[in-house]
Each structure stands twice: as C-alpha cells, then as structure tokens.
C-alpha cells in the first residue's frame, strides 16, 4: 500500500507557521506522528459531508473523529442547515432575548434529568468555568475536586493533571499545571484524585469536605480512551456530595446528548446538581450550556453570580440546537449509533484476535477507543501507561493511508454518527485488517510530500 500524499497540507502548514502560533488555532490540531518529512504537522481539510471528510490534497476519509465528537448526525446535515439558514435571514446576533432561547431551554429541560434551568454559552470551556463559579457561590467554598486524566476545558480553574507524564503520575495525585501561565494560587484550590477508586474519594471528601465546593467528573472519560465508571461509582459520588453539601457536576461536554438523548446521567441513572454540555447538542455548531437545579441556578443574576456573553444563546446556534434535539429526542438516531458502534467494536476485536494482537476495545458504541494492552479492563488514567501508545500511533498512520480517519491521540475516542453506513463499516474493517497486519510486520508508510512543498 502506497502512502498518501499530503503536498498541499504540508505547504499550508509551513505557511501557517508564520502567522499562527505552532501553525494552528488549537494546540490539539498539531499531529506528532503523521507528518511528512517534518514534525510536527497539521492536516488541512477542504470539506466534510455525512460520515466522510476530504483533505486539501483530495484524500477522502471515513471520519471517526467527528470534530472531537460534536458531529453526531453527520457533517453538513441538511436537516440542520435548513433550520439554520432560515434563521440567518432573521439576523445572526442580537445580544437581546429571543423566543428560541425559551423554546430550546424547555426542550433541554424535558430531556436532561438535572436540567430545571439552563444558561447558554459558546464552548465547553465556558460552560465548565461558569459551573465552577456557580458551585463556589452556592456553597461559599472554594476548593474543587477533579480526577486525574480528565480535561474540563482550557480555563485556569481545572487545567491540572489532564495528561501528566506517566512518570509523574505516581503515588498520591497532585495538581500538576498543564500550561504555562496558570497562577500558583489556583493549584491549591484544585484537589486531584484517581477516578473509579471508591475509597480514595471517600477519604478525601471526609477529610476536606468543608472546603470543597464541587466534585466535577466526566461520566465517561472522554479524553482518556472512553474509560467507563465502575458499577456504582457515580452513585457513590452522588451520595458523598449530598452527605457533605458539595455540588456534584457532570461534565457532559462529550457525553451529553451523545450516549443517550438525556446524556450519560440518563444512561447511568445518576442525577448531578449541575451539568455542562456542548459538542453534540448542535451537531457541530459552536454552542454550549450548563444546567441544573432551580435552587443552584438561581444564584445567577444581576448583583449575584455573573454569567454573560455577547454570543451566548445567539439565534443561529440555537436554531442548530433546536433542530438537532428534535432529531435526537426520538431515540432513532441513537439506535443507529448503538447498532453501528456495537458492530464496529465487535469487528475490530475480531480482527485483532485473527492477527494475534492483544487489544482491548474500550467504551460504549457512541464513543470508544482501542488499546494495545494485555489488560482486560482499564479503570483510570494510570492504566494507560501499560498500553502500547507507539503501536497505536503507527496504526493511525496506516489507517490514513487506507482512507480511515481516527484521532492521532490514543487518549481520544472513535466517535460514531447517524450517517455512518454499512459500507463504511465494511471498508473500515477491511482497512483495519490490512493496517494492523502492516503495523505488526513493522511496515509503516509515512505520508509523503514534495520536498519543496
């Protein structure tokens, strides 16, 4: 199998380096293992339709990144575009109230167990940042518990120990800053614990509960290979939070509206006090929200907790949400995701068995990941230290050559969408079989680009 050519992407990346720091608009777009002739690298996209994506060199891929998860129906879904384009004609942003805010908030409240009240935002980072502020105001406490390996946005409150080097993730977890520029004072307000460990979180809460405003957790570790909670773990967090007057926050930026119409809280039957959403709620449009009980959400308002934003609740984004939720609330799209994802997970595991490769398929059909490991289960970030990340990186390259797009980062997930087809499944499994055989044989065909590109 010949390697794909990425001449135009290569040239654009070199050009971008002169005007965009690191050549990108988000650090996560820098690939470290797939660039032709130069490292790092970023793939440049020309278009996306349905379950497929095309780069600027004309290479077509079956897409399992889905923009890090927002695209739950398919790229450029005409049902969403029709509603959005109709709203375009009424104006893009008012920075005033409009009826669709009420309509969509009521729709979210009807679907999400914790959502008595809703506030709209523009990104998952905004949503989690404001949820933390609300929790601190409500409890009149300042410390926040987060879990090692979880990412809750790029704000300073929680950008600790999202993916610490494995040689530093030993012993008792520490709040390790993941960026330069984070004030040291915030480190003392972020208490980091290991996920899925009943005893450790109970000891922490009993020792420091009177300082803790919130426990924030993803119900499924969306930036940690789709690790799922142990049976009863989310209920344990719920009980601990209730017993100690702590606000339990579910970060559903990735799981929300994806793993069930009512999010992971509906799937697992555990209701938090607050929850944050983004990504799938708009099928790719930039929109987010945070929601929770009336008592807690009513801390927001003039002369109380500040929340605002010129673009928050703008009519165009909410038109996308309105249309997307109308489709998702029936459950039919989720049935397709569940069926497709289950079959794909099973087929990939069968290929690995045929190739004699120890591989774990981890997660749920709507979002999952493959891990090259001898472990039968993974329960926390530190378990990923026992996975062959280099082998996954090589597989990523070979799958690109075969027209299948997974994320370069083994901590990320495969995301399925309603538009993924039986043909996509067959092509993916065939590509995976060939790619895995090549990787096992030490054959990795790096993408190529002209030296002068």
Protein language model annotation of sequence segments:
Residues 1-453:
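Conserved N-terminal phosphate-binding loop of PLP-dependent enzymes in the Aspartate aminotransferase
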């Amino acid at each position: 199998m010949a390697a794909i050519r990425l001449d135009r992407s290569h040239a654009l990346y070199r050009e971008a380096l002169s005007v965009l720091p690191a050549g990108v608009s988000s650090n996560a777009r820098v690939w470290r293992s797939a660039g032709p002739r130069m490292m790092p690298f970023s793939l440049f996209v020309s278009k996306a339709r349905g379950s497929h994506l095309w780069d600027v060199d004309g290479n077509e891929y079956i897409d399992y990144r889905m923009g890090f998860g927002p695209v739950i129906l398919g790229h450029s879904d005409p049902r969403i575009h029709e509603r959005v384009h109709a709203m375009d004609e009424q104006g893009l942003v008012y920075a005033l109230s409009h009826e669709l805010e009420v309509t969509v908030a009521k729709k979210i409240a009807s679907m999400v167990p914790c959502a008595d009240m809703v506030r709209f935002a523009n990104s998952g980072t905004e949503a989690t940042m404001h949820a933390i502020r609300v929790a601190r105001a409500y409890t009149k406490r300042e410390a926040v518990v987060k879990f090692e390996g979880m990412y809750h946005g790029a704000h300073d409150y929680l950008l600790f120990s999202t993916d610490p080097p494995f040689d530093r993730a030993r012993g008792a977890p520490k709040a390790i800053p993941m960026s330069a520029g984070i004030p040291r004072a915030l480190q003392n307000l972020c208490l980091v614990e290991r996920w899925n460990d009943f005893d450790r979180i109970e000891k922490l809460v009993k020792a420091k509960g009177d300082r803790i405003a919130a426990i924030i957790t993803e119900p499924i570790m969306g930036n940690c290979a789709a690790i799922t909670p142990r049976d009863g773990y989310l209920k344990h967090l719920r009980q601990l939070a209730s017993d100690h007057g702590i606000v339990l926050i579910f970060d559903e930026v990735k799981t929300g509206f994806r793993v069930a119409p009512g999010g992971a809280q509906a799937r697992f039957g555990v209701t938090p006090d607050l929850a944050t959403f983004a990504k799938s709620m708009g099928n790719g449009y930039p929109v987010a929200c945070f929601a929770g009980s009336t008592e807690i959400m009513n801390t927001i308002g003039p002369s109380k907790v500040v929340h605002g934003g010129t673009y928050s609740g703008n009519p165009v984004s909410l038109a996308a949400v309105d249309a997307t939720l109308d489709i998702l609330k029936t459950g039919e799209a989720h049935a397709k995701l569940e069926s497709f994802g289950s079959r794909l997970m099973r087929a990939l595991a069968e290929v690995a068995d045929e190739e004699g490769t120890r591989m774990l398929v981890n997660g749920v059909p709507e979002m999952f990941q493959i891990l090259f490991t001898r472990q039968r289960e993974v329960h926390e970030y530190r378990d990923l230290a026992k996975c062959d990340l280099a082998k996954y990186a090589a597989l990523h390259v070979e799958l690109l050559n075969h027209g299948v797009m997974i994320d370069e980062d083994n901590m990320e997930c495969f995301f399925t969408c309603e538009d993924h087809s039986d043909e996509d499944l067959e092509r993916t499994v065939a590509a995976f079989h060939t790619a895995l055989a090549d990787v096992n044989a030490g054959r990795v065909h790096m993408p190529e680009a002209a030296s002068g590109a």
